[in-house]
Amino acid sequence: MFVHEFRRLILYFRRHQLVHPTTRVALTTFLIGLAGTTSVVFGSDEFDPPASYYSAATGTGATLKSQLTAAMSAGHIQRSYGDFRSSAAIHDRDPNNASRILLVYNLASVSSTWDSGSTWNREHVWPQSRQPGSASNSTRGNLGDPHALRPCNPSINSSRGNKPFGNVSSTGGFGSQGTFYFPGDTDKGDISRSLFYSATRYASSGLVLVNGVPSGNQMGDLASLMAWHYLDTPGTFERHRNHAIFSQTLNPGYRTNNRNAYVDHPEFAWSVYMDQMNDTTLYFGDLEPADGTSTIDLDISALVGSTIDPMSFTLNKAGDDGTYYRVDASAGLTSSVSGCYNAFPMNMAGVNQPIDLGFDASITAFAGQYLGDLTVDNLDVTTMGGAGNGNNDVNDIIFVEVNVYEPGQGSFDGGSDLNTLNLDLGTINLGTGDASQAYSFFNIAAGGSFGAPIDVELISSTGDTGVLATNFAQVDSLANGSEAMFSASMSDAGTGTFSATYTFRVYNDQSLFPNEASIEDLQLVLSGMVEAGGCSIADLAEPFGTLNFFDVSAFLNLFAANDLAADFTDDGVLNFFDVSAFLNAYGVGCP
């Protein structure tokens, strides 16, 4: 168990870089959980036992049973059978009406006032005829223990008699079924855990749970009780009842100062009453892992203030045995399944449980990185089922990384928000070469490294696009603070005054934010003029506008003076090639 969990801890450290407070909280909880072998430290709620109550319950099987007997006996204030007449108003209180109580089996809400058993009387879950002694108002022990008693309709109590509970496949309402009595779907788990308690707390009195029909001080049917234990998990009423029986705050006059371990830790029941080879493995994904560990890496990109839709995952169970499991989600995450009172039933391999993972609005309130997780822990404590089974089943974790970005912002300027760029390509002469000028798109989002990348697409072009053009190609994932460089050009093929408008649409990176609308449109407005022009570049001397001997003389003088004005090839050297280039230009003449 520890080797597997230590490996998981290393993975946890590697994945979580201490960049978010909830990471540290989750990690602390994880470390505490590793401190014991069987004891599990749960998140606190109002019905939880004191942190140290089960601290010595670290074994399995008979050892664990003895440890639980000791825990439930230490400081136990035994109450009498007569005390239940008053204490029921506290621990069996109707949550919707404080002056009434809920009866076992039929769930009737009746006045809590004791009227000598006319409205309700005291049901021994473990029949008094199947345990030593007989009940009187002064009787203590299991006969007077409120964990082993329930308020009941008198006629229902009488009809049940001392029948054991059984018929594992029964469903629906309560009632006799031949040799056995069925407590009903609502109470079958509660009844099972009450009997588990009695057989542990009062084991020294000879109370024993058996399969089939019991005799003497025995009670059963254990197989049915165990199956019901996983089908009907501890609910709010049962947990409140357990805590109210124990609590000085809730029950100052009749508190027992002891608890039912099988309500607080339902995962203990299998090891105590079945065997040490629970075969369950829980996992996410399609294939059962050998060691039971499964992980999902969930990487999400979101914009500040956006809503992240819930996501569904399937938790699978392999093995025929039943098991309880715990689901914890980091702060900021919600889960449709949570806490430690979740169970997979017995004799049902291949079943699964959908888990919906939700995301609180706080995650996207600010730009930055959120790290959290949803962890599933198979709570079974047995270790002999093999690798990946029971307590050897390593936790299953959905790692959640959310990178929250400020929206991207496109601009033609790297220092300010410029949505329209007017680019004048000037005036050129016909046939003297195209004009060109560079321009860039910038991403100037807020948020630094958490400014969203942008995509830029050309959506329309109007005007003289045959003359004024751009070499633009679609921009994908332009990081914040980066630029994409392009150029605009004007053709020298025809004369005139030209203008063209190119409209570009800017999106937050569509590979990260596929459902987000566009951010804005940018416009590139191009203009320029192509003139018929004068003489060629060989027109070096007055009178300008004509080519004659004076232009030839001017060139020769410049060449002789080694003046680079005669460098018609623009290579920084005066030679024959410049003379040839001049003569070619001279040959072009004037229009």
Residue ranges of predicted features:
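N-terminal secretory signal peptides that target proteins for export/translocation
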Residues: 1-22
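Bacterial N-terminal signal peptides
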Residues: 25-38
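N-terminal module-boundary/linker segments of secreted carbohydrate-active enzymes
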Residues: 41-107
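Short, His- and charge-rich active-site/binding loops that engage polyanionic ligands
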Residues: 101-112, 117-119
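Domain-level detector of nuclease and nuclease-like folds
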Residues: 115-276
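Feature for long, exposed domains in two main contexts
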Residues: 275-535
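Cellulosome-associated attachment modules in secreted, modular CAZymes
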Residues: 530-591
